[in-house]
Design a protein with these regions (language model features):
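Hydrophobic core segments within long, regular secondary-structure runs in both alpha-
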Residues: 7-18, 34-38, 58, 118-121, ...
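Charged alpha-helical initiation segments
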Residues: 1-32, 52
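A short glycine/small-residue-enriched secondary-structure motif
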Residues: 9-13, 52-67
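Amphipathic alpha-helical interaction surfaces
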Residues: 23, 40-47, 126, 130-133
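Short, contiguous, well-structured surface segments enriched in hydrophobic/aromatic residues
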Residues: 28-58
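Small-side-chain structural scaffolding
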Residues: 10, 17, 29-30, 34-37, ...
């Protein structure tokens, strides 16, 4: 029998979720398989001293602010709070104080930061915590297998650290319009 390390396990879960999605299998099953990979990868990223959610938020804000400084749309949802954050980071970029996403300091509580992924982990936690609320229900509108996969692939990139994605991942991201 072959030995499977955690990165390989995560890669196999993501690959399986992509295959399941392409075969139009149950969205809950696809979402949970992708979320399982994300959960594993999030912990691997943390073992490297980073926080997945904080990194994703910083990268998103930085890219939006950079776009704004170049006269392009920020690409963020309409929100006064987000606009203020993106504007502040754009000012920092223009002043030379912000040169990368790593220069952004997050002051939000960990709970607030982690709320960003609630929509991804809701179906996963629904199944995981059946002992706490055996009569709970879940709306199928809460399933977002494509979003869970995109996050899992982002976490995979962070955990891997070399910027390389397996070909099936890049094919999926191109189909989703995430990679060009």
């Amino acid at each position: 029998m072959a030995i499977v390390d955690k990165m390989t396990a995560a890669e196999r879960l993501i690959h399986s979720a992509v295959d399941m999605l392409e075969r139009n299998e149950d969205p809950l099953a696809v979402h949970v398989v992708a979320s399982s990979a994300l959960s594993l990868l999030r912990e691997l990223v943390a073992s490297q001293g980073n926080d997945y959610v904080s990194q994703v938020i910083k990268e998103g804000v930085y890219r939006s602010a950079l776009a704004k400084t170049q006269g392009a749309p920020a690409g963020m949802p309409d929100s006064d709070i987000l606009d203020a954050i993106v504007n502040a980071v754009a000012e920092g970029i223009e002043a030379g104080r912000v040169k990368s996403a790593g220069d952004i300091v997050m002051v939000a509580s960990k709970k607030t930061v982690w709320a960003y992924l609630d929509y991804i982990f809701k179906p996963y936690n629904f199944l995981k915590h059946a002992d706490r609320d055996p009569l709970a229900t879940l709306d199928e509108a809460d399933f977002d297998p494509e979003g869970a996969l995109a996050h899992a692939m982002t976490a995979y990139l962070m955990a891997r650290g070399d910027g390389e994605l397996p070909e099936p991942f890049t094919v999926f991201l191109k189909k989703q319009g995430i990679l060009v």
